[in-house]
Amino acid sequence: MTNLEYARMILNDTDSSNQIFTDSELQQLISQNSEIKVVPAAPKNLAKTIWQIPYRKLDSTYEAVVYDEYQTEYDATTDYDAGTATLTSAPDYPVFMECKIVHWNDVKADGLEMIATDIRRWNSYSDTGLSEQFDKASLLAYSRSIRSARGVEL
């Protein structure tokens, strides 16, 4: 599943004849809620050939790099959906993965805010029967509640 397909799925925008967001709008939401980060990985098997990071559904357009604490790179096959790296040889030191992480809750929150504040999108959302359960204020409150707490607002 591509990033755009996943974004459409979490925003309930899967009707191809009546799409609420264009591909470029969704791509912009994904890129503004993404960051390149180095995260520690934990071994997932006893042979230490499969390593897990605490993120799922990574951005597959960015080539992930796996290395140890001495910055020795390892040949690895990355599963971007599961957030795992399968190494060809077991390392002797802790492993880190440099990857592009998408904060999907923030993508969803931004998308819901765009729906609530744009009458065209709100009407399209209403046509599919998804807005009948809550009003705009509830939708905005829900988007605030799912947003990740990062950084400091000044």
What does each model-found stretch correspond to?
Residues 1-104, 114, 145-154:
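Conserved short "hinge" loops at termini or chain/domain junctions
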Residues 72, 121-152:
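Charged low-complexity stretches with an acidic bias
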Residues 102-134:
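Amphipathic protein-protein interaction modules
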